[in-house]
Amino acid sequence: MTSPVAFTGAPSAQADTVRAFFFISAPVDPGLLPRLIEPVAKLGAVPTRVHASRESGDGSELTVELRLTGVAPRTADLVGRALRAVVGVRQVMAVVEPERPD
């Protein structure tokens, strides 16, 4: 089961860049992490954070948190779609929010 992208706050047509948080769950597989990073790299982005854990339950489930910052909204959408298409991925939850100027 996959989840649609959730936008926090009011959508803004003026948002040049966004922050995207992806929470992925899948059965443990040694080749999963490279398959999750590949679509990000192909789109020219570098993750701000990647954290993988199999600490909960019996260890047969891998949860991965992947964060992107400073990416175009379209890039965040494409990454989300690509993550959902990765073989073995059970669920992808995404939160995308406009970046605030400092």
Please place each PLM-identified region on the residue numbering.
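A conserved regulatory-domain signal marking ACT and ACT-like small-molecule sensing domains
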Residues: 2-102
